[in-house]
C-alpha cells in the first residue's frame, strides 16, 4: 500500500513493479568487490568498553592495506530521526543531507558512501541497540533514498554482559540488511559475553576467534 501511494498507482501494479525490480536485480547480481574500506560505528567509551576491546582484536587481524575509519556517536549530538514525510526525506536526501544536519551528514553519510563494509560495534545493555546507534540507523533513511547499499557488506560485533546478543544481531539484519539494503555475508556477526571491565580480552581463545572473524 505504501509503495502504491508513493508511486501514485494501485496496489497490484505496485506489487508487480516491485517484483519485476527484484527479479531484475537478482538476475544482474554480481559478487561485491573485495573489501578495501571499512567503517566502524560505535557509541562506547574506549576506556571501559569490552566491545571496543573486541574490535581492536578484530582490527589487528585486518590486512595492512585496508583503510579503516572509526566514528564515535557518543558525543551527544546525534539527534534521532524527525519522522519527515517521504517527500521531505527524499528532498533532503537529494541534497545529500537530512533534516537535522550535523555529524550524521558531515561525517557518517560520506563515510558510508565510501565504505565497502560497515561494522556495527554494539554493546548490549538492554537487549537492544544503543540509542545513538538506533538514531544513526534511523537517519540513514535519507541517504538510502538516493543510495542503495547492495555492494556494502554488513558486520556486527556484539558484546553482552549476560545474554541477548542474538537479539541485537537480528535487529541489525532487520534494520540494515532488510530495510537499508546492506549486503549480508555468511556468519556476519561475532557475539561474545563479557560482564566485567576488561574481561573480554581474558576470554579463552578470543584472539584466535577475533583473527578468524
Q: In which residue ranges do the predicted regions lie?
A:
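N-terminal beta1-alpha1-beta2 submodule of the flavodoxin-like/Rossmannoid cofactor-binding fold
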Residues: 1, 16-145, 185-186, 198-213
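Short, glycine-/small-residue-rich phosphate/pyrophosphate-handling segment
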Residues: 1-23, 149-189
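Extended non-globular C-terminal regions
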Residues: 192-193
